[in-house]
Regions:
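Proline-poor, low-complexity alpha-helical tail modules
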Residues: 73, 148-171
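Amphipathic alpha-helical coiled-coil/heptad-repeat segments
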Residues: 1-142, 163-166
Length: 171
């Protein structure tokens, strides 16, 4: 979010009309560096060996409605339990997070009007990234809840086993 917030700050500076062409070129240079970093993060972020936000052979839905993050054509299956039974796998949607898919390649700070238009693209990208973060957050909470339940179950089983052993010793 911080990079997107910085982009928004740059767009607002561009949209206010007080900057000359040299200043706007500097704003555009910083924007380009931020977009390169967003693309780098999107293409290199991994969980183990699983690429979270990109895959060369994935088909992406790039027909977004502004704020909707492009969904990759597959999910990340996360096994929840100790066995591979059906129902014990959590499928987490994958998203591509890149400047093109977030429509940040449409931003331009070269004049006031383009700067104003860029604010909208950046706000849409912020909303899209928030939705992706919420999706991963929900998956994390699901896994955390499952982990806590399994820990309680394990503790209860150990307590029951201990009680049975104590009973057998007393006999």
């Amino acid at each position: 979010h911080s990079m997107l917030q910085r982009l928004k700050t740059l767009a607002l500076k561009s949209a206010n009309g007080t900057y000359d062409q040299s200043d706007r070129e500097t704003l555009n240079m910083e924007k380009d560096h931020i977009l390169e970093e967003i693309d780098r993060i999107g293409s290199t972020t991994k969980f183990g060996e699983i690429s979270l936000f990109s895959r060369a052979d994935a088909n992406t839905n790039t027909n977004t409605q502004g704020w909707q993050p492009p969904v990759l054509d597959d999910t990340i299956p996360l096994q929840i339990g100790g066995s591979a039974q059906a129902g014990e796998v959590l499928d987490v949607e994958r998203y591509y997070i890149g400047s093109k898919e977030l429509q940040l390649d449409q931003t331009d700070f070269s004049d006031v009007k383009k700067g104003q238009e860029s604010v909208g693209y950046i706000e849409n990208a912020i909303e899209a990234v928030s939705k992706v973060r919420a999706s991963f957050g929900a998956a994390y909470m699901h896994l955390d809840h499952t982990h806590n339940n399994l820990s309680v179950t394990s503790e209860n089983m150990q307590a029951a086993e201990s009680q049975i052993r104590d009973t057998n010793m007393a006999e």
